[in-house]
From Swiss-Prot:
InterPro entries: Deacylase_DtdA_archaea, DtdA. The gene is dtdA. Disulfide bonds: none annotated. Its EC number is 3.1.1.96. This is D-aminoacyl-tRNA deacylase. It comes from Pyrobaculum calidifontis (strain DSM 21063 / JCM 11548 / VA1). The lineage of its organism: Archaea, Thermoproteota, Thermoprotei, Thermoproteales, Thermoproteaceae. GO terms for biological process: D-amino acid catabolic process. It comes from the Archaea. PANTHER family: D-AMINOACYL-TRNA DEACYLASE (PTHR34667:SF1). D-aminoacyl-tRNA deacylase with broad substrate specificity. By recycling D-aminoacyl-tRNA to D-amino acids and free tRNA molecules, this enzyme counteracts the toxicity associated with the formation of D-aminoacyl-tRNA entities in vivo. It catalyses: a D-aminoacyl-tRNA + H2O = a tRNA + a D-alpha-amino acid + H(+); glycyl-tRNA(Ala) + H2O = tRNA(Ala) + glycine + H(+). It is an enzyme of class 3 (hydrolase). Keywords: Hydrolase, Metal-binding, Zinc.
Amino acid sequence: MYVLVLSMGDPVSRTFLDVTGPMPLLKTVGNVEVRKYRDMPVVIHRGDPVEFGAEEVLASLGKWAIFISRHEMANPKPFLTVHTPGAWPDVSVSNPRLVSSLYRALCKVAEEPFDCAIEATHHPPNTSAVSATFLEVGSTEAEWNSRRAVGLLQAALEEAVKGGVEATPTMVIGDLHYTTVGDLVLKGDIDVGHIVPKYVEITLDVVRRAYEKHTVPIRRAILFRKNVKNPTRSEVVEFLKAKGVDVVLKG
């Protein structure tokens, strides 16, 4: 079951609450409220999404957490993004099916001037019992507080949780922050889980940790060879092939 996470310290979460209207209170657990949106439990806490630490509450309600959040970037533009969180070298559990379904839905509902993207794995929280997926609106206060923008996010969420395409579960190693393999996701060739960006220190241990934290077994890995130098590249390829993973070298 999906679990929605809203953070009162986050402007997009607050706008989402404004767009959706009242949600019935089911119970209070510690300092978080559990409410209901459609058929989905909603956990509401007072802090920022990256500060969330009540994973045990999420685990009691479902398996797949979706965090509604703002997106920020150095050169702001209207953006709808999705990604798995993780503060390297550790990461959250990634849900390739959900990340990819949300990306396809975001690109389907996106209207001018919004663009859509899958981001590399970055920032907390790190989960171990449930998968975590961040669904974001960017990249300035104008978009964060826009009912129209957050309405697009809401529409994508409702589209994605219906299910749909199931493609080859794939992790990506050495890519840019905004992944360059999005077209493969849109075509239904792959479902993307963890994306290890080129700017982190890529080691065999980092790749192993990411590989192990997915909701489904990884069947393919796309590795950008220019961004993963030997001997690490050879170690990573050997490890993945030993797991039965189809390794695709790019770049």
